[in-house]
Amino acid sequence: MDYQDTLTYLYNSVPMFQQVGGSAYKEGLENTLTQDAHFEHPHRSFRSIHVAGTNGKGSCSHTLAAILQEAGYRVGLYTSPHLVDFRERIRINGQPIPEEYVIRFVAQERGFFEPLHPSFFELTTAMAFRYFADEKVDVAVIEVGLGGRLDCTNIIRPDVCIITNISFDHTQFLGDTLAKIAGEKAGIIKSGIPVVIGETTPETKPVFLEKAQTTGAPIYFAEENDREDYPGIEYELKGLYQQKNARTILTALPLLKEAGYRLDGQAVRSGFARVVELTGLMGRWQKLQDSPTLICDTGHNVGGITYITEQLKQQAYRQLHIIIGMVNDKDIRGVLALLPREATYYFTKASVKRALPESELQELAEAAGLEGHCYPDVPAAVRAAQEKSLPEDFIFVGGSSFIVADLLANRDALNLY
C-alpha cells in the first residue's frame, strides 16, 4: 500500500470519531493496555506533559512544544483532530511523522490490530507513542482526545498535567453538568504529579480540589497566578482566548523547571512568538486574506464561540460575512444564539459524515434571527462571500474544525495565503 491506500484503510477499517461521531468512541482502557503491552510500553521511554480541557488544549500543547523545542529538546507532539493531513497529529520538532513510517507501521501491525477492533484514536495513539520511542524524543506533549479519565492517552505518567478549562461539549460521553465534565477531565490528575488548572467556575473548582486532595497531587490555578516571570512576551496567536492559554502555560513553566527542564527566557519568548512556524499550528484565529480580511477559527462549541463573538466585536469593518457549518452532535442552538444578527450568513457543511446539512442549519439559524443563504460546500460559500464583499469587509469562517479543514484544503484554489 502507498500512503493514500494506507489512509483509506485506516479511515475505513477502524471507527473514526472525526467522521462518525459517537459510534467511534470506545470507553475504557482495555484496548489501550493491550496495545501498550504489545508495543512494550513505549511511553515509558520518554518524558511527557499531559494536556486536557474543553477548549484551548491544542493551542497550549503546540505552544509548550514550541517552547521546549527552542530550549533545545527533541519534542514529540500528539494532537487531534488533523485539519488537512493525518500526519499533523504526530510531530517531532514540528515535522510531521513521515509517510513511510505510517505505511510501515500499518502494514506491520494490521494483523495485531484487526482482531482487537480498536478505535481510530486508539490506533493512532499507539502509532504516536511507538514513533516517539523509536525516534528517541526527550519529551512529548500529549493532548487528550476526549475527556481524560478513560482517554487512551491516560496511561502516561507525565511530569505535569494541564486542564485548560471546562465547557459543555461531548456531553453524551462526559456528562450533562460542568461538574460531571470536570470529573472526567480530572481523571488525568495523578498521585504526586502537579496539575495546572487554566480556568474554573464555582461548579468545577471543588471537583479539581477534591481530586487533587485524594490523589496527593499539587494543584495550581492559573487564575491566581500574578507572576511576571517573562515581561514583554509577544504572542503570535492573536485570539482573545489565547490570553488565558498563555497564563496557563506560564503557570506550568515553573513546575517544569522544578522537574528539571532547562527553560530560559529566550526559549519562552521565542516559543510564544513563533509557535505557528515551529509546530505547524493552524486554524486559531488564522488570517488567510487581506482586503477583505478573511479569518478562520476552529472554535466549535459555546465556550469557543463566546470568545470568537467577543473578538468579532473588536474588528473594524463595513460589513461582516460569516461562513458557518456545524456537526450534528453539538449544541447548535446554543452556538447560534451567540452569533451577531447584523452579519450576512453563508450556511454550508463540511465533507464529513457528521456534518449537519446546510438547509437544516439555515432553518435553525433563521429561528435565531440570522439571515443568509445555503451553499453545498465550503469553497462555494467562500467564493460567494468573496464576490459579495468589498475590500473593507470582514469574512469569518468557522463553526467546526471540519469547516476550517475544508477551507485550508482548498486555500490555493480560493487564492488564500
Language-model region placement:
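Short functional linear segments
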Residues: 1-53, 60, 66, 70-71
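ATP-dependent carboxylate-amine ligase catalytic core
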Residues: 22-29, 34-44, 70-156
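Residue-level signal for inorganic ion chemistry
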Residues: 54, 75, 141, 164, ...
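Extended acidic/charged loop-beta regions that coordinate divalent cations
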Residues: 81, 124-173, 205-234
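Nucleotide phosphate-binding/pyrophosphate-handling subdomain across enzymes
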Residues: 139-144, 152-162, 167-170, 230-344
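Internal gly/pro-rich beta-alpha loop/helix module
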Residues: 160, 173-180, 185-188, 193-254
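C-terminal helical cap/extension that packs against the catalytic core
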Residues: 200-220, 293-294, 302, 335-394
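Glycine/aspartate-rich loop-and-adjacent alpha/beta segment that forms the canonical ThDP
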Residues: 400-417
